[in-house]
UniProtKB/Swiss-Prot annotation:
It holds the Pfam family PSII. This is Photosystem II CP43 reaction center protein. Coiled coil: none annotated. It is found in: Plastid, Chloroplast thylakoid membrane. It comes from Tetradesmus obliquus (Green alga). Binds multiple chlorophylls and provides some of the ligands for the Ca-4Mn-5O cluster of the oxygen-evolving complex. It may also provide a ligand for a Cl- that is required for oxygen evolution. PSII binds additional chlorophylls, carotenoids and specific lipids. One of its GO terms (biological process) is photosynthetic electron transport in photosystem II. GO terms for cellular component: chloroplast thylakoid membrane; photosystem II. NCBIfam families: psbC. The modification Phosphothreonine is found at T3.
């Protein structure tokens, strides 16, 4: 009986016998068909851009200006808002038209890419080497492969520079640290000091150091993109105009599956970094759009109760909690004045609504008694009830309100999805790296299944 999974099924003129791969192996059937593989890639790009455009318009259609973005489950509009589109002081949305334009532009682009994908999949030449040698390639051609790497690096560099140009010359970007609670700001003095920019890379990823995730000002972010954009473009030119050195020729496996494994490893790393960035960072991911970080929600709660009880007559400087430590304020391990209670674990949190109340030795008692502004109280109360925690009542000392039961923070969505996808991509990296290395070493592909128990079992029919 013929089934979808046996070798006799032919799809698109290609069967398992002629290609070595079944229909469900997807693009593996196109390994040596550069024209058809181009079609698959362009169509894939079209799907990605279509999702971006359609989801963008979906979020615009459902957007309620009176509610914060993070309360509406949005993940695309916060990115556009962070780029300075449609927002004003305090992150307030003042114009949704730029978001609509973004969605339409992506939809139009996806149509062009979709047409190109269909054309190259069905009509265009199966291979490019004969008709279009510049675009053709052989997987083992080391020089051609590094040329292609170079083109990719240049495009990535241009992408990084687009953010720089937007921030410096085309309207600026949203800066959560702008005085008074955040605003769109032109970055006139980006950090170009290599010691500062690359100092982030040399930091420990643990504890309060936080590697590149610890970046806490827009000047460093834009300056970092200047460096990354320039290095990517220069690296791209290098790889285009040079051939791989002997040590590189020997060190790497030069096959299609090897390149796939390298790409999966790189994307996996990016996924893990994006996970940490979206979860911990409130500069690149402003809390006005993505909601508070976990530590931020916890500190907000401590601040809110301090404000409330201070108004009711409590002496917040000396009141003791049930453990004998300070109920509202206490000392950090290094002597700074910090919030007391369970939020002590987040004592090194930094946020634009709290920093004005600090002095040279942590929180300033005089400022806490006399200088708290209404916008700080409002923001802390809002953040306190929108913690990015998967709990109906209490986690880590953060109490949520009944109205927050159905709230899931965009930080939770973004961090979880990027971690899970990053992990799967890492497994894919290991899988394809192992296959590529085995093939390069001349091993038998696949696993010997002669001893599988299923082979000795009675057929189902």
């Amino acid at each position: 009986m013929e089934t979808l999974f046996n070798g006799t099924l032919t799809v698109g003129g290609r069967d398992q016998e002629s290609t070595g791969f079944a229909w469900w192996a997807g693009n593996a059937r196109l390994i040596n068909l550069s024209g058809k593989l181009l079609g698959a890639h362009v169509a894939h790009a079209g799907l990605i851009v279509y999702w971006a455009g359609a989801m963008n318009l979906f979020e615009v259609a459902h957007f309620v200006p009176e509610k914060p973005m993070y309360e509406q489950g949005l993940i695309l509009l916060p990115h556009l808002a962070t780029l300075g589109y449609g927002v004003g002081p305090g992150g307030e949305v003042i114009d949704t038209f730029p978001y609509f334009v973004s969605g339409v532009l992506h939809l139009i682009s996806s149509a062009v890419l979709g047409f190109g994908g269909v054309y190259h999949s069905l009509i265009g030449p199966e291979t490019l080497e004969e008709s279009f040698p510049f675009f053709g390639y052989v997987w083992k051609d080391k020089n051609k492969m590094t040329n292609i790497l170079g083109y990719h690096l240049i495009m990535l560099g241009i992408g990084a520079w687009l953010l720089v140009w937007k921030a410096m010359y085309f309207g600026g970007v949203y800066d959560t640290w702008a005085p008074g609670g955040g605003d769109v700001r032109i970055i006139t003095n980006p950090t170009t000091n290599a010691a500062v920019v690359f100092g982030y890379l040399l930091k420990s990823p643990f504890g309060g150091d936080g590697w590149i995730v610890s970046v806490d000002n827009m000047e460093d972010i834009i300056g970092g993109h200047i460096w990354i954009g320039t290095l990517c473009i220069l690296g791209g030119l290098w790889h285009i105009y040079t051939t791989p050195w002997p040590w590189a020729r020997r060190a790497f496996v030069w096959s299609g599956e090897a390149y796939l494994s390298y790409s999966l490893g790189a994307i996996s790393l990016m996924g893990f970094i994006a996970c940490c960035m979206s979860w911990f960072n409130n500069t690149a991911y402003p809390s006005e759009f993505y909601g508070p970080t976990g530590p931020e929600a916890s500190q907000s709660q401590a601040f809110t109760f301090l404000v409330r009880d201070q108004r009711l007559g409590a002496n917040v400087a000396s009141a003791q909690g049930p453990t004998g430590l300070g109920k509202y304020l206490m000392r950090s391990p290094t002597g700074e004045i910090i919030f007391g209670g369970e939020t002590m674990r987040f004592w090194d949190f930094r946020g634009p609504w709290l920093e004005p109340l600090r002095g040279p030795n942590g929180l300033d008692l005089n400022k806490l008694k006399n200088d708290i502004q209404p916008w700080q109280e409002r923001r802390a109360a809002e953040y306190m009830t929108h913690a990015p925690l998967g709990s109906l009542n209490s986690v880590g000392g953060v109490a949520t309100e009944i109205n927050a039961v159905n709230f899931v923070s965009p930080r939770s969505w973004l961090a979880t999805s990027h971690f899970v996808l990053g992990f799967f991509f890492f497994v894919g990296h290991l899988w394809h790296a192992g296959r590529a290395r085995a093939a390069a070493a001349g091993f038998e592909k696949g696993i010997d299944r002669l001893d599988e128990p299923v082979l000795s079992m009675r057929p189902l029919d």
